[in-house]
Amino acid sequence: VLVHAVRTSQELVYQELIANLQQEYRGKLTYIPIVSREKHQHILSGRIPALLRDGRLMQAANLFPDKHNSFFYLCGNPAMVHDTRDVLLALGFAKHLRRSKGHFSFENYW
């Protein structure tokens, strides 16, 4: 599942590339665009932490992660990464460390 969150729909770049990858990996790549400052009929609206916390993100992906089979990779705005990490911890997921396997890893990209 690729979750691509931006402020406005104009920032949803790489649409052609993502569509080609979805075609190539038919049924193996789910793409979920999210905008935080606009409302669109076929795009989730809000911030990733809130959408994860209230279940709308998982519902859109048609996946319900569990601690045995799920791994999250977070990359982006440091505030989003921090807030999403906090939600994952509150949901019982653990940070992946070299010395102990966890459920998520992250990097800040700005």
Describe the role of every protein-language-model region.
Residues 3, 8-110:
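Reductase modules of NAD(P)H-dependent flavoproteins
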